[in-house]
Design a protein with these regions (language model features):
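Secreted/periplasmic carbohydrate-active enzymes, especially glycoside hydrolases
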Residues: 1-242, 250, 261
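Active-site mouth of glycoside hydrolases
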Residues: 5-10, 15-24, 30, 40, ...
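Active-site rim elements
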Residues: 34-38, 320-323, 456-462
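Long, contiguous hydrophobic alpha-helical segments, chiefly transmembrane helices and signal peptides
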Residues: 35, 46-47, 210-212, 244-245, ...
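Generic recognition of flexible, low-complexity loop/linker segments
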Residues: 37, 146-147, 295-296, 380-382
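Substrate-binding clefts and catalytic carboxylate motifs of secreted carbohydrate-active enzymes
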Residues: 41-45, 308, 379-462
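Substrate-binding cleft/loops of secretory-pathway carbohydrate-active enzymes
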Residues: 322, 351-392, 402-406
């Protein structure tokens, strides 16, 4: 069945969500069902790489690590088999494969960053497999710490884990790790406000960045070169964080690899956005748990990932007192994330606060920005708006920019390119939920005219 055919059968009565209520039940990028910046085109099919990998039956299933600024490092290895024979009083309940009885795990860890493992740059440790779960500890002298963009360098160390059977390497995992520690500081600021501050290696970080939504509407077409260009532009603009938005998708490995090397911290959403969550549907909850376990295990080795978030603008953000999904994000998802990671802060949603209103500016982080409001009311009021808002951490603030001239030429007939007209209003997206009832094209023109002076031509506007 196509995505549309599946959705036709969904009964979403009693739930709240923006743009498309039935999307709640479909585990797919939510923005594919239409957003104020994305068309309603829910394609279906395989959108990532497909590989056929030959492997042995008994092998490594996962490797993850924990690194500490002291230089201590633990590498954890999960296998898809055991070498233990578990016994009860009257019977054996698990038989190990005899060929695996003498398996060995070989750990190789670089002692210097940003250089390959070699005879002069690596510590080797071998030990017998102890069961499905195994680990080994190391200490690296004078470790070089990983820092966000603008705060220092991003040294990355190589590691390798090999499964040795009968003197031969039958499976291997390689990766990179970094020494850095993350904390979220929430302490009293004054009598009525609580701080919300991210700390890296014990240092308060002034977070600067933006949302990251899928770089193409059809995500299968995103090339590595585009990830490199966009993330490099973010770094050169002095960003230090990208917020992988909950209405999009868990990004490809290459995205996180580039962020690791560029010092771009990643705020990683679980993929829920702007709606209730049907926590009363057991099948839905089970599916989501499997999804989150897979993604946490896939992403937890990236030093750039510093923050987990249970979803974007769940219904508590809309000043609703009764919402569906609180237990899901507060308990089920929090427990799942902490069980499989536990080294990073987890927030129930964004925005979040310590009161019963998610978008309360007195604590937590808020989407109550002052930028757009000040432009609507007059840019001379900007400083007053900033002061009046009094928010502790602004995690999202809607902003608009133009397309390219080439894009506009593909969108509009030659005689409709400029000035703005009914074609612009028809072919640019809109947000019916916005409190500012100004078409997006006219809002963009307002931004341009207010900040840079009146635009007489399309080129001036762009």
């Amino acid at each position: 069945l196509s995505t549309g055919q599946v959705m036709d059968k969904i009964d979403a009565k009693g739930y709240y969500g923006v743009f498309n209520i039935k999307r709640l039940f479909v585990r797919k990028a939510q923005c594919h069902f239409g957003w104020d910046w994305a068309p309603d085109m829910p394609g279906y099919g395989i959108c990532g790489d497909v590989k056929l990998i030959g492997c042995v039956k008994n092998r490594i299933s996962d490797v993850h690590y924990r690194a500490y600024n002291s230089g201590k490092l633990s590498i954890f290895v999960d296998l898809n088999y055991t070498v233990r024979e578990h016994m009860t009083e009257d019977k054996q309940i698990r038989q190990c494969d005899p060929e695996c009885a003498n398996d060995i795990l070989r750990y190789v860890v670089a002692t210097r960053p940003d250089s390959p493992i070699s005879e002069g740059n690596g510590v080797v440790f071998e030990t017998k497999v102890t069961g499905e779960k195994n680990f080994a500890n190391f200490t690296i002298d004078n470790p070089e710490l990983w820092w966000p963009n603008g705060y220092g360098k991003q040294p990355l160390y190589d590691y390798k884990v090999q499964l040795v059977r009968g003197g031969k390497v039958v499976d291997e995992r390689v990766g990179r790790f970094a020494f850095r520690e993350i904390a979220l500081c929430q302490e009293p600021f004054d009598r009525t406000h609580m701080k919300y501050c991210l700390q890296v290696n014990g240092v308060n970080v002034f977070v600067k960045g933006s949302n990251w939504v899928p770089a193409e509407c059809f995500i299968g077409g995103i090339k590595t070169e585009k990830y490199l260009r966009l993330i490099d532009e973010a770094a050169r603009a002095n960003f230090n964080m990208l917020r992988v938005w909950g209405g999009g998708l868990y990004e490809k490995d290459v995205f996180y690899d580039i962020c690791d090397s560029k010092g771009i911290m990643v705020w990683q959403y679980l993929m829920f956005a702007c709606s209730d969550i049907p926590e009363d549907d057991p099948e839905f909850v089970e599916t989501c748990q499997k999804e989150v376990v897979f993604q946490v295990c896939r992403l937890r080795n990236h030093p750039s990932l510093v923050y987990w978030c249970g979803g974007n603008e769940k219904t508590g953000s809309y000043w609703h007192k009764i919402t569906k999904g609180d237990y899901f994000v507060d308990v089920i998802m929090r427990g799942t994330v902490n069980n499989y990671d536990g080294t990073r802060p987890y927030a129930r949603q964004s925005p979040c606060s310590l009161t019963d209103v998610g978008n309360d500016v007195t604590s937590g982080e808020s989407h109550a920005g002052s930028y757009e409001r000040s432009l609507i009311d007059g840019v001379l009021n900007y400083r007053n708006k900033v002061s009046d808002t009094g928010v502790m951490f602004v995690s999202e603030c809607a902003n608009m920019g133009p397309g390219t001239i080439e894009i506009y030429k593909r969108m509009f007939p030659e005689d409709k390119l400029w000035p703005m007209n009914e074609y612009w209003r028809d072919r640019l997206m809109e947000n019916p939920y916005s409190e500012f009832k100004v078409p997006f094209c006219e809002r963009q023109l307002l931004y341009a005219d207010t900040l840079y002076g009146e635009s007489d031509t399309l080129r001036q506007f762009v």
